[in-house]
UniProtKB/Swiss-Prot annotation:
Swiss-Prot/TrEMBL keywords: Cytoplasm
Family that this chain belongs to: Belongs to the RTC5 family.
Pfam families (UniProt xref): TLD
Cellular-component GO terms for this entry: cytoplasm
Name this polypeptide is given: Restriction of telomere capping protein 5
Function: May be involved in a process influencing telomere capping.
Places the protein is found: Cytoplasm
Record flagged with keyword Cytoplasm: yes
Domain TLDc, chain residue ranges per copy: 351-587
Source organism of this protein record: Debaryomyces hansenii (strain ATCC 36239 / CBS 767 / BCRC 21394 / JCM 1990 / NBRC 0083 / IGC 2968) (Yeast)
Keyword Isomerase applies: no
């Protein structure tokens, strides 16, 4: 659309940079012009048509009901009975978008209502288009933290009380902007293109906000992450199916929230059910936790809100009518319509696998940029101890014929002192498992609770086999901690170990991930646990996860230690009595790709309908009118 200078032109213009002064209102006007031009006409049309307006300046505010309609998260008829959790999240989103709407003057007092201008500016950042105006190095995560914080409440009140005249002075302040190839004859739309926004000191300093003085409420972040986890559980398929899937997942909010409580403990290990409403998360905790734990999940969720919702040409009417789309009946007249394929067998969830747990596991795989995809449509239950019995032979008979990746999950309650002292099978297991901690020190940490229920998962890419002598596996194996806290342990890249971190021993030594081959000779039976390892004894009754960060350990290192700030430097163990053990086969993603094509086709058809309306007006003029750059009697289109 010509909204940015080419590289050659920019290099030439850099030789002629002029510093000019502008008022705050003028700076905002120039930035807003450039913001609008980062969007396609069909995207602007998607917003205006859903809200029943001709241009984005026609409507002064966006209500929560408007936001629901734009996001397409529930059906129109369900708006009156909206879930209280969704209402909470909508308020968080609305407040966040309102703060970003002040950009670059983030310390400005915001209006109590969300505007379309703020929504558009939020779309600029959450879809990554800010890189066109700023740079790829701009700290997006810092902006998100500021937008989620209480900056417009506590922080601004303190600022105002300490310097009561500061806000008035700011309105009259002149700001220096670097302008490339400045000409006094430039119209606003042309001048806005010549400004070097990335050098503007207010943008570079985030308007001088003191990050140590603001925070994000842990409870609000829990609700937001739960919403994100629910969104990520919905695969791209026909929009009718997506909305139905989303509605069902929202109805099971508590299941997703339980996992998100584990996830938020990756940000702050001390958070629990009792203190979450009073806990505040600092910027350092926020940045470190999200950057190390789930950066793609966080940014992709924001992206999805705009891509599949606010900027999508699909309206709720389109969703309601999508069952009548040609693609649903295999219309032979349109060769681009996805073909209808037979449905995969109905997925039946288990004690350990449901939409919520799948969503967390998928989040991990995507963050690690794994080629594997896990959904309800490609998981096949191979073994469940509660159904087939907790027997190593039964486990072997169920999983060894599967020649594709598998997902193992094991769950149970922490072993208590009574069991340690009086359960003979545990005592025997403990004697075979070398102790790392001195008898005088407790291996249990303050953040571990006697009543914890632990769930670990392991992604295994190699086919299972008896490995009573040599380990098997590859460097794509990963151990996941799903509860009571979230964590992940990727394989170490080592040309000697070569990812051979797994054994399946049916001669009395069970299963091991991250261990060396156990010793099993004559009367000597001994496990050789690695620094980061999960050991399941042969009766499938007890398991131990070990995490040793100390450099003086003698154990093998098949897996990387935790990157969670507090955990990374700690030595600890999770010893638990197994209540559930399951293995699932990970099948083909062909069906997923077919459904994604159906989603893409519906989006394309909706955009085509919008484009017809735009061409009727003349696309360029229609776009300028929608963003409010020209009126009915103006022909100013210089920015194009």
């Amino acid at each position: 659309m010509g909204q940015v200078l080419s590289k050659d032109n920019e290099d030439e213009a850099n030789l002629n940079v002029t510093q000019k002064q502008f008022t705050k209102d003028k700076v905002l006007e120039y930035f807003n012009i450039q913001n609008h031009l980062q969007f396609r006409p069909v995207e602007i049309r998607a917003i205006t048509s859903k809200l029943g307006i001709k241009n984005i300046k026609e409507k002064s505010d966006v209500t929560l009901n408007d936001l629901i309609y734009l996001l397409k998260i529930i059906k129109d008829e369900d708006i009156e009975g909206i879930d209280h959790n969704i209402k909470h999240v909508l308020n968080i989103l609305s407040n966040s978008f309102t703060v970003i709407g002040n950009f670059p003057f983030l310390q400005s007092e915001t209006t109590p209502k969300l505007s379309i201008e703020s929504l558009m500016k939020s779309a600029l950042f959450h879809t990554g288009r800010y890189k066109r105006l700023l740079t790829a190095e701009y700290d997006y995560l810092k902006l998100v933290f500021i937008s989620l914080s209480g900056i417009n409440k506590t922080y601004l009140e303190e600022k105002t009380s300490s310097s009561p005249s500061s806000s008035d002075d700011k309105e009259d302040t002149l700001y220096n902007l670097d302008v490339m190839g400045f000409s006094s004859e430039d119209e606003d739309s042309i001048l806005s293109r010549k400004i070097k926004w990335n050098t503007f000191n207010v943008i570079q300093s985030f308007d001088d906000i003191d990050l140590d003085s603001i925070y994000v409420g842990a409870y609000d972040l829990l609700k937001l992450l739960t919403f994100f986890l629910i969104l990520s559980s919905v695969p791209e398929m026909s929009h009718t199916q997506m909305q139905d899937h989303l509605s069902k997942s929202i109805a099971r909010w508590s299941e997703f929230e339980t996992y998100c409580l584990s996830i938020i403990r990756y940000i702050n290990l001390d958070i629990n059910v009792k203190n979450i409403k009073s806990t505040k998360i600092s910027y350092e905790e926020f940045k470190r936790g999200i950057s190390n734990g789930f950066p793609l999940f966080f940014s992709n969720a924001w992206m999805k809100i705009f891509k599949n919702g606010i900027l999508s040409s699909i309206s709720t009417t389109d969703v309601a009518n999508s069952n009548n789309a040609p693609g649903s009946h295999g219309d032979a007249n349109d060769n681009e319509v996805p073909k209808v394929h037979k449905k995969t067998p109905n997925f039946v969830e288990s004690k350990l696998i449901n939409d919520a747990s799948i969503s967390v596991i998928s989040m991990c795989l995507k963050n690690m940029k794994s080629n594997l995809s896990i959904t309800t449509q490609n998981l096949i239950k191979l073994y469940a101890g509660s159904e087939s019995g907790f027997s190593i032979r039964s486990l072997e008979s169920k999983i060894f014929k599967w020649q594709a990746p598998t997902l193992l999950l094991v769950s149970g309650k922490r072993v208590k002192n009574k069991t340690m002292k009086h359960n003979n099978r545990y005592i025997q297991f403990n004697e075979m498992y070398p102790s790392y901690f001195r008898s005088s020190e407790s291996p249990k940490k303050d953040w571990q609770d006697d009543n914890d229920k632990m769930t670990y998962a392991v992604i295994i890419n190699s086919p299972w086999k008896n490995s009573n002598k040599n380990n098997f596996g590859d460097e794509d194996t990963v151990i996941l901690n799903l509860s009571p806290r979230f964590d992940f342990y990727k394989s170490v890249h080592n040309p000697v170990l070569n990812g051979k971190s797994i054994y399946f021993n049916n001669l009395g030594m069970g299963l091991g991930f991250g261990n060396s081959q156990p010793i099993n000779k004559n009367t000597v039976k001994k496990f050789l646990p690695g620094d980061i390892s999960l050991t399941i004894e042969a009766n499938l009754e007890f398991a131990i996860f070990r995490h040793i960060s100390s450099p003086n350990s003698n154990g093998a290192s098949f897996f990387q230690k935790s990157k969670q700030n507090e955990i990374s430097v700690q030595d600890f163990e999770d010893r638990f009595m197994i209540s559930d053990l399951e293995v699932w086969g990970i099948g083909s993603t062909k069906e997923l790709e077919e459904q994604r094509k159906q989603w893409a086709w519906e989006e394309k058809q909706a955009e085509a309908r919008q484009s017809v309306n735009l061409r009727g007006l003349g696309e360029e003029r229609a776009f300028l009118e929608m963003v409010g750059l020209v009126g009915n009697h103006s022909a100013n289109g210089g920015s194009m």
